[in-house]
Structures are given as C-alpha cells and as structure tokens.
C-alpha cells in the first residue's frame, strides 16, 4: 500500500540517465508511436469558453488536461481519480504538465518531401538518386512528370516529361505501356525501389576504374551517403513524410492578453495552414475533383509543410498578420535566440541579483561588501529554515512575515546564515574565467556592492558606474567548489601567462613609488665623510626610525644606513647593513620573512613592473596565504602614502622643451629637401611620402625624448638638495596613470595622425595640448579619434565572435591522463626580431616538460627527459649557453581524446603541474580571446597617433666572429658590400665555436661586416631600405635593355608637379601584340654580348610591373649597383585593426590573397616556356626526384634568376605563406612554429603576453583530421578525411590482423570548419549551420557519446572536466561493477536452469 501511495506522488518517472544520444530519420511508424492522437481540425480554443476545441491543435483529449487532475468537463476532479479517462470528454485525469511532452500527428492526404533533406546542401535526396536539385523541385512542385517504369517504350527511366510530353507519350504508346508519376509520391516510389547494395557495389567499381580527376570525388560523395543509409538503418523513403508530428501544445502556447486578444506562437499558424490544406485536399479527393485542382492543392500542402519546417528556405517567406516572417521549427533551433544558444547553453538562474559597484579599500582580498537588502532577498530560504530551527516561527508563512517586517532577529539570523557562505560576483562581459569569482560577503548599509580594488584588473572593472551580478551557490558541493576553486584568493595568477593578476594599480602604485624615491641632500641624510655627526642617518630598528620620521629629523626619501634583520639560506637569523631610505624600510616591513625574499626585493624604485615582480617572488617562495596577506598590506600602505604625498597634476608640470622649434625647423628643412629631390625626379611620389613620414616620426620621437629629459629632471633647491620630482613624471614612470605617448601629446607634439583608411597624413600636428591646436590641426586629429570610436564598437563584436569560435573548437581538449609516453617533442629557440630578443628561451620553456635530456657543456644533465623545467633550472640553462631545447607539447601528444598532463606542462594559474580533468582547451580559448576584446576597446586611447614600425637593419645580439654562408657579395660603385644573392647568411660564431645566430640577408642589403670580423653586441651587421626592393647587378659591365619598348612595356612618366621623367615598366600583357614580351635588363660585355654568370646563365634580370628603371642603356655598371627598384607599399599604421583580423585569418587558416610560393624540394631553378600570361618555373630537385613546375603570373616579381639554387621551404615568390603549404612542405612542427610566432607577434605589438601553449592547444585542435592517401586493407577510401584517433584505432586493428595499414597526411582545418566537424553533432549544431549539421547527423544515424563539455551542458549533465571528470570516472566504475553483477546473475540463473533441466520431471515439479 505504502508503495502505491509513494507512486501516487511520484507521477512522472525520474529523468533517466544516459551516456549517449543517437539521432536518425524518423519513420512514419515512429511518429505514430509518439503521438497521442490525430489532429483533424485547425481550431485552437473556443473564444467564448476559452476551452480547447476537440481534435484541434490544443485538444485536451490528445494532449492532456488543462488543470492538474481535472478533466475538461469537470466530472472528475482531484487526485483520487488519477488515471481515469472521462467518458464524457475523453480527457485523462492527470497532471497538466503532460501537455509539455505529449505529441500529436497529422495524417497527410498526400506524401510530402522533407525540405531539410531536399534543400540542405548537398541535397541528400538528390545525391541518393543522382538527380539535380532543379529536376527534383520540378517533380515535387508538380511541374514535370518522371518516368518510373518505361516498359517497352523508348522513354528512359527517371526521364522528366512536361505535361504536354506526358500526354503525347500516352497517346503514342498507350496509357498502360509505361508508368510516370508526379509529386512527392513519385520520388517516394523511386526511393522505395532503390537497391542500395547494388548501387554501392557499382560505385566502388567505377571509383576503382575511373581515370579522371574530378569524377571520383563526385562518386565518393554519393557512395558515402549510400553507405550512411546502409549502416544507420534509415530507409530512403523516410525522407518523404506521410505523417507530420505535432509538438506538444505547451511548447507553442496561446496566451490571453488583456482586452480579449491572444498572443500565439507562430507555429500554431503554420500548423493551421498545414491542417487546412490537408483537410481541403482530403475533401477534393473524396469529391473526385479534376486532377489539376488536386495537384495544385498537393503543391500547396507541400509548401505549407516546407514553411512549417523551415520557413523561407524555398520560395517566398510566409508572413503573419503583421508582415513579420513566421518562426518555423528550424528557426526555433538556430541562431543566438534559438533553443541551443538561448535556453540550453545559457540559462537565467534564480538566487541572483545585480547592483552598481563601489570601491571597498578596507575589505580583505577574500571579501566583498553585500548590501543588507540584497543579502536578505538572496538568502531567504536559508533564513526561513534557520528561523524555523531556532523556534522563531512555526510555519514558512510566519517566517515570511518576519522577514518582510525586517524584525531585529532576522538580521541576527542573516549574519549567521551568511557566515562562511561564499557568493559569486560576475561582471559582464565574462571574457575569461576570472570574470566570475567567489567572495565572502560582508553586510553593508547602502545599495551598492563593494569590490576589493585588487581584483578590478581580473574583472576589468572600474567604478564609473559598472554593475556586477551576485550569485549564491546553494548546495554544499557548490559552496565547496566556490571556496576551493573560485575564491579570489585562489586566483592570484593569470591563466594566460602565469603572471600575478592581483597587481596594485593607480593610486597604490603611486603611493609605493613615492615611498621608494631617493632624494639627494634631504634632511637627516647619512654622510660617510661627516666627522661631526658620523651616526646621523644610521638606524638599527624600526621604532627608532619611526620616531625620527615623526620628529621630522629624517624624511621618507633621505639616504640612510639600515641594519636589516632576516633569514639566511638555511632559515637562520642574519643581519646586514644596507644603503636605503626610510620609505623603503617601511615597505620592507610588510614583506614576509623568508630566506628567498631578501631586502633587495624592495630596495629599488618601485614601478608597477617591480611591484608585480615582487608579488611574483613572494608567491613563488612563500605560498598563497602569505601572498594574500602581503597584497592586502601593500594595498593599505600604497593608499595611505599616496594620500599623504598629496601628488597633484598642475599645468606647469607639463614642460615643453625650449628647443622644440629648432628641432621642428630642422625637420621642415629635411622635408623641403625631400620635396626638392622629388621635384628633381630622384625619388618617386611613394618614396617621398615614406621619407617625409619617417622624418616627422623621428622628429616626434626626438622631441618626446627631449621632453622626457626635461620632465624627469629633479628640481633642486638653492642648497643643491632635491626639492621635488615632477608629478606627471611620477604618475607615468611608476605606471600609475598615463603613458609616455600621452605625455608626448601633452607637452611635446601630437605627431602624425592617421586617416580613417589607415594611411598616415603627411603633415603632422606640431602643437601639443598644452599650447593648443589650431583649427587645421584639430580637424586633422578628429579623423583618428572618430575612427577609434567607430572601430571600438565594431571590433568588440568581432573579438567576441573569435572567442566563441575558439571555445567551440577547443572545448573538448581536457587533461585525460598523466603521461601519454610519446618521445616526440618540438624544438624551442629564443625569438629574435630585428636583432632584439623579443622572447627569451628561458621564458618560453619555463614550466614545460623536456623531450630529451638538457645537458650542459661539461656533460652534466641539468634536466632529465620528461621532467618539468622550473625556475631553479634557468640559471644553469642560461649559463650553459643552450640555444635550443626540445620540449613536450600538446601538438605531439598521443592521448586518444584530450591531452596528457606531461605534454601540457604547468598549470599557469596555479604554478603547479596541471590537474587531471582541467579544461585546457577552454582556458586556451579564453586566454587568446580575452585580450582581443581588450585591445579592440583600447584603440582610441592614443587618438590614432600613428606608429611606424618597420625594421631596416640587423644588429648583432651576441659577440663573436663572422662567417658568411653562400657568399655572393659585391662591392658597388660607392664601395659598399652588397648582398647579390638570395641565400646569403651571416653566421655569428661564439668564442666556444657554437653558432650563436644565423641572419639571412635581404637581397640588395648593404653588408657592414665581412668574413672573419669580430663583432660586438649591438653592432650593425647589415641595413637596407625598407621601402624599396632593389634588383642588383651581379657582375660588372654595360647596361642593356631587352623587350623594353616605349609605350608597350615601358613608359616615361613625367611627374606633373616636377616635370621630371622616369622610366617605369607597365603591364605589357594587355594586348595580344605584346603579351609574349619578357622585359629584362642585361649586363653586357664590351662586344655587346650578355656577361655569363658563375652559375652558367646570362646576366639577365627580368623586371616586374611597376619596376622603376634607374640606369640608361649603355651606362657602366659595377657588381652590386642597383639596376631597378620596386616600391613596396607605403607604411600603414599597424594598430590592432591589423591585429584582430590577422589573428582570425591565421586561426581560420585562410589562404592569403597573394600567397607566397614555397619550394617543395631543394634544387635548381630553371625558367621554362611561358604559358599564356604566366611564367613557367621548373625546380629540379637535388635528390633526383621528379621536377616540380610552378606557373607564376607575369607581373609578380620573381627574385630568382635562372640557375639559382633554393633550399626546401625557401620562398620563390614573396608574400605571406599559406599555412597549408607550410604543413605540406615542412611538416607539423614548422607549421606550429609559424602560427605561434605570427599570432604572438600581433599580441606582442600590443604588449599582451600569452603563453605559447595556449596557441598550441588551438593548433592541435585544427590538426585533428587526417586525409587518407592509401586505404591499405581497410574499406576506407583514398581522399577521405577521418579523425587522427580513428586512424590510430583502424591501424591497430589492421596490424593485429597482419594487414596493410592505412596511410594518411595531416590536414589543417580553420577553427570554424574544425568546430563543425567535431565528433559530437550536438556541439556542432549549437555552433553554426544548425540545419545542415542536424540533417547530416540524422542521415548518418550519428551517435553522440557526450565526451566534450558543450554537449554535456546541453543535455544537462555534469561536464566531464574538473570535479565533473571525477564524477564521470566514478560513474564508469559503478557501471562496470553493475554489468559484472548482471553477468554473474545471468550465469547463475543459466546454471540453475541447467540443473533443473537435468532433474527427472517429477523432481523438477
């Protein structure tokens, strides 16, 4: 009995737990099995009684009662009749909730094609039948007949006949001699009669025998879909519907508005149209209406069902009464407002609130101030429970009343409830995981949330009206996770780069900086040579010092001697005397006592960088608790001293250099000189522009340097003592506020501005803000500012979209095992750009595991294979002069799904080895995406002031001796050494004989060193003009022209403003007469024959379009002289506008517009016969393999000559290389290095630091797929793409059976494509192109094993990462045990049954 009572209350079965989801095409039987009844009428509800109409779209008999446990006519009410079906109205007495999950159906009078399988490209029905979509539509929409059985007539099977042709054929051959049909019935019949096995066999044979290039691809597509139908158990005819399911009424509600009107879901309108047309069709068929009317009605039914499934996919969009397109079933799923993204991936939650934030400087780092009113509302259930437990109230109702009246006991209980109960604060946009953190609430008066100043950087919050949301973790587990994982004290380091994120900023920095300034000649200074008072300024303990400060006998900045007492390396007390200032001593008072944290940490000028380094040191050595306490103390100290210092901002603090105008005048003269050169025809318009812009940029920098010199100078008083430091300089130098670029605009000159197009305006703004701009300057500067504001708005969206794509591609990269055991690795070197080390090796390898022993020169092993490189190893690595380290990387990780902890290395946010189940993919995506948004929002801070960044020289970053590889240098007429070859490299050899650096020289560069020279650090090796690419003679001789005819391939342009002529190569391919010219310059000997070069070919130099010729025919030329030059594009400003699209372009693996052509092998270049308007280049490889041909458009500048030798991977034609080419030619490691460096360069330009491993994780996800080059002994076809892991599994099986394994090459997919091709169809569908993904998944009968994070969020289970991964492991163990128990049971049962069967019959009974 008890059991029954329990069942009574427990109506609906608990949601069952599942491990996978399968999607397939539903058969008509399946649809009927879901349905609770057929819907025959289009009516919804009765307008007078508001009761649903019987057999209508809201029918209670089919879908269930409107009110809980009450039938429609009211005969049966209450729980006791549960399950009874009313004989009057036919409604089952049960919960009204069943109206959310009971479905109905509509029996169609004529079959209808499912638009998804018809129109979703590629058309599945079209592929199966091998018919064009156009033809299919003509059949389905009743325009043409299709022949099904030709019989003995000359018609062909599946031939299309128009109405007239059909009638004619019937007359000619007789009505019964052949069968032709029209509409969805025809297609259904053809699909039913398909012999899938036969077609598959025929296709396989054809693929094997075909010779053409394109045909196998087409056949493979068709074979794939046929095999999909065979394997999935879907029947082709199910793509034609005979029954339409109707979704439950509560999912398409009809809600009464006031005023007697109704708001309805669009689906009801769409269903109504289908039912109306279906009923009309039934009636017409019964009435035996003429064929043409019935056909028209069938066509309309087809269109109505199309609109229901996917409105607007074909034909006109069906609109409602207010001219707005109706939302069909497909629209319900897709897009930001669709079911996936709106309701499944992001839900609104209760127990949350939001309010404005204000600063809370007296809070501890783990606290936040929560307004009492908010807390009372958020913690209501807890308060009710506690009131009840304490006996203040007997019922919830009483408790409610107490809380509403805000009785004093309620506040006491609120205090108890809140104690130790963390809340989560979140600021939108949440760009990375630090955008939501847990704090302990502290009750405050007022209505604003108080936030600790040090966590602002993580939230990117400021107090100018930002709002934040509060969420309450309810369950004990949630509170535990919030405290252990999300507490602000546990998030001290930034997950993107492992540096502290809890860094003081603004006032705190200013206060600490002020505290650590040293002043000369301040009061109470210690002078060693002062005989009268040798002990002045000598202090031994802090009390004494504080007294002196209070008595003003010493100032914060005086130089003093101080006895510091701390701990030695073994923890024993030591003391040491330092030269320092009282301010720094006060600062040292907050340092934790630790042998590794000496006084030197604070005995320096504290800028923001130094403070960050200090926090880092404390965190690494003293652990988390000490660091948190230290941060809080340092904050209090900074604030109090900034307040006492009284640093202010005055107009006289902006010092304009006195020599400003002389510098400006010098530059003006220089610009005038360039104008003159241009007028004289020595330089082109473009070159003049570049030089002018350059000159002004240099002037601007020089002025800025002068101004900085003036501002940073300390003012002295009449005694020669330091009076005060410039306030603005202190703010900028400390990193509290403002940057040198802003100071430059305030007090030097605003400098160059950019046009909205990104070009730099030639005339700079010479005034600064202190002097004020004149009207013209102001107008010029508005350009940049306006562009900045417009860009910000646009790019925030772009950046968010990039983050979304990154998260989607990386969401299933989770740490799954400790070590995958691979021996592979990737090589890491320091990154050097224009002679500067931009990323030192030590920083790049820190926290990564080695792939081979790291050995010093004396043979001692610094780090063993598989160990992690820690901070303690770095000094030894640097001392050993190691240039290259092979480390483990996720790119080579062999873990099946996910990655292993060893390949990933250190968890940057914790500074420890990464934990199992850490979602490293999502962290990588957030780390790359978050600064994208930051940067885009930051463009306008410098008001579009132009930055010119182009390197035009190489400086040595090492000392050593010079060696020159592939030497082809020549002395030109000016006596300079010029690089005349493409592969000249300068090698710097260290004193120990190792190669320290290799610099490949630009062709045409002036070389400042020669073989055997010794070189110092910072010395110039070579330089070149960044704005032009020269074509250089390699031998001495006389200039000759070839195919350079005036007006055909060359033109003398006279510059209008100067009247000077110059010769430029023009596009000669335009007319047929000139298309086979090959314009070139020759170097001739005395007899007028071309000089032979060392490699055997003539000294002939082909010229590209737009080359400017510098010498006349007959002029003498020396090797190394410039024959002609090609202008490169003028310098555009590089701000992150170039940045974000560039990052997206790299991650999407798009082919660049003018892609570089890369040599596939090492070999020799020959020019072959031209082909149409392309040049033919042949590369004959050194290894004797087949020659490779390249066709290059004629205007492209090929900087190779006949007979040049190229190495594998050299550029034959300049440009950005296509990542796919790098992968194919140089392999995965080179590709990864290229992508990492290119992406890092964009971020580095903006001063954002991201660890390489994040980019590697994303690149790994882009390399998931393999293209099959040889199917081996498997049934996989050549040219197919499958997952890496699948390939490994197949090969394991094949090798075990002794068969030939499959061969494949890795394929690079862009992030969008990779996301759409993930194994999980749920994840792909929730990303983009929902319809296409679901259609394809259904045809293939795909199974989603719910391995990634996203699909688990969507189905509402715990994600398999973090604490959820442990839960998943425990579940799988339980499942294994269950299955074992079941096996044992069934074995026992079988044994018992066997025993029984052996007994004689009587005994068995």
Curated annotation (Swiss-Prot):
GO MF entry, a single one: DNA-directed RNA polymerase activity
Catalytic activity annotation: RNA(n) + a ribonucleoside 5'-triphosphate = RNA(n+1) + diphosphate
EC annotation from Swiss-Prot or TrEMBL: 2.7.7.6
Positions contributing to Mg(2+) binding: 462, 464, 466
GO biological process: DNA-templated transcription
NCBIfam families attached to this UniProt entry: rpoC_TIGR (TIGR02386)
Family, as annotated: Belongs to the RNA polymerase beta' chain family.
Cofactor comment text: Binds 1 Mg(2+) ion per subunit.
Amino-acid positions noted as binding Zn(2+) 1 in the UniProt annotation, renumbered to this chain: 71, 73, 86, 89
Lineage, top ranks: Bacteria, Pseudomonadati, Pseudomonadota, Alphaproteobacteria, Hyphomicrobiales
Function: DNA-dependent RNA polymerase catalyzes the transcription of DNA into RNA using the four ribonucleoside triphosphates as substrates.
Signal sequence bounds: none
Top-level taxonomic group: Bacteria
Cofactor requirement: Mg(2+); Zn(2+)
Quaternary structure (record): The RNAP catalytic core consists of 2 alpha, 1 beta, 1 beta' and 1 omega subunit. When a sigma factor is associated with the core the holoenzyme is formed, which can initiate transcription.
GO cellular component assignments: DNA-directed RNA polymerase complex
Keywords tagged on the record: DNA-directed RNA polymerase, Magnesium, Metal-binding, Nucleotidyltransferase, Transcription, Transferase, Zinc
One Pfam family linked to the record: RNA_pol_Rpb1_4
SMART domains named in the record: RPOLA_N
HAMAP family linked: RNApol_bact_RpoC
Organism: Methylorubrum populi (strain ATCC BAA-705 / NCIMB 13946 / BJ001) (Methylobacterium populi)
Name of protein: DNA-directed RNA polymerase subunit beta'
Gene3D superfamilies: 1.10.132.30, 1.10.150.390, 1.10.1790.20, 1.10.40.90, 2.40.40.20, 2.40.50.100, RNA polymerase II, clamp domain, RNA polymerase Rpb1, domain 3
List of residues binding Zn(2+) 2: 820, 893, 900, 903
């Amino acid at each position: 009995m008890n059991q029954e009572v329990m069942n009574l209350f427990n109506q609906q079965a608990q949601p069952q737990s599942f491990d996978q989801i399968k999607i397939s095409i539903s058969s008509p039987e399946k649809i009927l099995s879901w349905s609770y009844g057929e819907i025959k009428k289009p009516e919804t509800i009765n307008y007078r009684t508001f009761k649903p109409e019987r057999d209508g779209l809201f029918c209670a008999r089919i879908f269930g009662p409107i009110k809980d446990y009450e039938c429609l006519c009211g005969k049966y009410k209450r729980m006791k009749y549960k399950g009874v079906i009313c004989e009057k109205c036919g409604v089952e007495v049960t919960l009204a909730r069943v109206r959310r999950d009971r479905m109905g159906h509509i029996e169609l009078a004529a079959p209808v094609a499912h638009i998804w399988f018809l129109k979703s490209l590629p058309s599945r029905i079209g592929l199966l039948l091998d018919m064009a979509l156009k033809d299919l539509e003509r059949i389905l929409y009743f325009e043409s007949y299709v022949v099904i059985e030709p019989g003995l007539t000359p018609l062909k099977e599946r031939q299309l006949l128009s109405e007239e042709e059909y009638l004619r054929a019937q007359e000619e051959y007789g009505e019964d001699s052949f069968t032709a049909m029209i509409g969805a019935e025809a297609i259904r019949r053809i699909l039913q009669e398909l012999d899938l096995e036969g077609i598959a066999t025929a296709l396989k044979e054809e693929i094997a025998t075909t010779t053409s290039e394109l045909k196998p691809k087409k056949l493979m597509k068709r074979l794939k879909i046929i095999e999909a139908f065979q394997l999935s158990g879907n029947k082709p005819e199910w793509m034609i519907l005979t029954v339409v399911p109707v979704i439950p009424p509560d999912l398409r509600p009809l809600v009464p508005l006031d005023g007697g009107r109704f708001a309805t879901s669009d689906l009801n309108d769409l269903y109504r149209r289908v039912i109306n047309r279906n009923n009309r069709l039934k009636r017409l068929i019964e009435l035996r209406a003429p064929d043409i009317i019935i056909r028209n009605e069938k066509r309309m039914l087809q269109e109505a069902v199309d609109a229901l499934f996917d409105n607007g996919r074909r034909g006109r969009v069906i609109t409602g009464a207010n001219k707005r397109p109706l939302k069909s079933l497909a629209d319900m799923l897709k897009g930001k407002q669709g079911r996936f993204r709106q309701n499944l991936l992001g839900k609104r939650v209760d127990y949350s609130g939001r309010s404005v934030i204000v600063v809370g400087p007296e809070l501890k780092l783990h606290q936040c101030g929560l307004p009492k009113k908010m807390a009372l509302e958020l913690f209501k259930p807890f308060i009710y429970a506690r009131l009840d437990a304490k006996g203040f109230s007997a019922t919830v109702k009483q408790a409610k009343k107490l809380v509403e009246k805000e009785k004093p006991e309620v506040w006491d209980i609120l205090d108890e409830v809140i104690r130790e109960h963390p809340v989560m604060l979140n600021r939108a946009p949440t760009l990375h995981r630090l955008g939501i953190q847990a704090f302990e609430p502290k009750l405050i008066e007022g209505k604003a949330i108080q936030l600790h100043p040090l966590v602002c950087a993580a939230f990117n919050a400021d107090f100018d009206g930002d709002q934040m949301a509060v969420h309450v973790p309810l369950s004990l587990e949630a509170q535990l996770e919030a405290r252990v994982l999300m507490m602000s004290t546990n998030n001290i380091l930034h997950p993107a780069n492992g540096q502290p994120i809890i860094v003081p900023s603004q006032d705190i920095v200013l206060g600490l900086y002020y505290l650590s300034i040293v002043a000369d000649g301040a009061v109470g200074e210690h002078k060693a040579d002062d005989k009268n008072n040798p002990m002045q300024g000598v202090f031994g303990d802090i009390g004494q010092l504080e007294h002196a400060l209070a008595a003003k006998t010493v100032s914060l900045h005086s130089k003093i001697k101080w006895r510091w007492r701390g701990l030695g390396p073994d923890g024993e007390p030591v003391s040491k005397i330092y030269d320092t200032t009282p301010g720094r001593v006060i600062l040292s008072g907050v340092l934790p006592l630790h042998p590794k944290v000496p006084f030197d940490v604070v005995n320096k000028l504290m800028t923001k960088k130094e403070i960050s380094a200090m926090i880092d040191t404390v965190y690494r050595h003293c652990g988390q608790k000490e660091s948190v306490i230290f941060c809080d103390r340092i904050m209090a100290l900074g604030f109090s001293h900034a307040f006492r210092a009284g640093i202010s901002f005055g107009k006289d603090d902006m010092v304009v250099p006195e020599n400003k105008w002389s510098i400006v005048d010098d530059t003006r003269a220089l610009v005038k000189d360039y104008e003159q050169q241009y007028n004289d025809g020595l330089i082109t318009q473009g070159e003049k522009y570049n030089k002018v812009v350059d000159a002004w940029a240099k002037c601007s920098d020089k002025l800025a340097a002068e101004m900085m010199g003036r501002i940073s100078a300390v003012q002295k008083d009449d005694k020669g003592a330091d009076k005060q430091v410039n306030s603005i300089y202190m703010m900028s130098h400390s990193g509290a506020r403002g940057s040198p670029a802003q100071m430059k605009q305030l007090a030097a000159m605003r400098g160059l501005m950019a046009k909205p197009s990104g070009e730099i305006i030639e005339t700079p703004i010479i005034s600064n803000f202190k002097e004020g701009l004149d009207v013209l300057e102001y107008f010029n500067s508005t350009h940049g500012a306006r562009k900045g504001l417009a860009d910000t708005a646009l790019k925030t969206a772009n950046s968010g979209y990039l983050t979304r794509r990154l998260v989607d591609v990386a969401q299933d990269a989770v740490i799954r095992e400790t070590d995958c055991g691979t021996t592979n690795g990737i090589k890491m070197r320091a990154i050097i750009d224009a002679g500067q080390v931009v990323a030192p090796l030590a920083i790049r390898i820190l926290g990564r595991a080695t792939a081979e022993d790291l050995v010093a020169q004396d043979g001692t092993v610094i780090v063993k294979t598989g160990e992690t490189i820690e901070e303690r190893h770095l000094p030894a690595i640097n001392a050993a002069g190691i240039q290259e380290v092979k480390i483990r990387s996720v790119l080579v990780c062999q873990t099946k799904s996910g990655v292993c902890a060893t390949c990933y290395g250190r968890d940057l946010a914790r500074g420890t080895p990464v934990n199992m189940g850490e979602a490293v993919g999502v962290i990588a995506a957030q780390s790359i995406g978050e600064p994208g948004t930051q940067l885009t929002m930051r463009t306008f801070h410098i008001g579009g002031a132009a930055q010119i960044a182009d390197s035009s020289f190489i400086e040595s970053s090492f000392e050593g001796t010079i060696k020159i590889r592939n030497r082809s240098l020549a002395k030109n007429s000016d006596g300079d050494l010029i690089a005349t070859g493409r592969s000249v490299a300068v090698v710097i050899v260290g004193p120990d004989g190792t190669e320290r650096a290799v610099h490949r020289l630009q062709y045409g560069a002036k070389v400042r060193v020669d073989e055997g020279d010794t070189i110092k650090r910072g010395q110039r090796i070579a330089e070149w003009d960044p704005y032009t690419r020269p074509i250089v003679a390699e031998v001495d001789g006389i200039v000759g022209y070839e195919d350079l005819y005036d007006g055909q391939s060359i033109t003398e342009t006279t510059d209008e403003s100067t009247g000077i002529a110059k010769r430029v190569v023009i596009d000669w391919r335009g007319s047929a007469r000139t298309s086979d010219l090959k314009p070139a310059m020759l170097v001739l000997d005395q007899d007028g024959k071309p000089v032979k070069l060392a490699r055997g070919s003539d000294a002939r130099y082909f010229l590209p379009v737009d080359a400017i010729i510098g010498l006349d025919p007959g002029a003498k030329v020396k090797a190394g002289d410039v024959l002609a030059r090609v202008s490169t594009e003028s310098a555009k400003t590089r701000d992150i506008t170039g940045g974000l699209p560039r990052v997206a372009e790299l991650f999407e693996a798009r082919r660049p517009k003018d892609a570089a052509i890369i040599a596939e092998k090492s070999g020799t270049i020959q020019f072959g016969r031209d082909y149409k308007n392309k040049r033919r280049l042949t590369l004959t490889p050194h290894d004797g393999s087949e020659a490779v041909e390249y066709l290059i458009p004629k205007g492209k500048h090929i900087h190779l000559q006949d007979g040049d030798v190229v190495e594998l991977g050299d550029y034959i034609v300049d440009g950005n290389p296509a990542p796919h080419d790098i992968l194919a030619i140089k392999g995965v490691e080179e590709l990864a290095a290229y992508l990492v460096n290119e992406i890092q360069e964009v971020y580095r330009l903006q001063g954002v630091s991201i660890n390489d491993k994040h980019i590697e994780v994303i690149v790994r996800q882009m390399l998931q797929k393999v293209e099959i080059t040889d199917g081996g002994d498997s049934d996989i076809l050549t040219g197919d793409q499958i997952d890496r892991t699948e390939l490994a599994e197949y090969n394991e099986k094949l090798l075990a059976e002794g068969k030939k394994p499959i061969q494949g090459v890795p394929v690079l997919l862009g992030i969008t494509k990779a996301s759409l091709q993930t194994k999980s169809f749920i994840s792909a569908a929730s990303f983009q192109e929902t319809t296409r993904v679901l259609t394809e998944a259904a045809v293939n009968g795909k199974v989603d094993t719910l391995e990634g994070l996203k699909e688990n969020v969507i189905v509402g289970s715990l994600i398999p990462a973090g604490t959820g991964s442990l839960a998943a492991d425990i579940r799988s163990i339980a499942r294994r045990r269950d299955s074992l128990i079941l096996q044992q049971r069934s074995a026992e049962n079988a044994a018992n049954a066997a025993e029984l069967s052996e007994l004689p019959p009587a005994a068995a009974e």
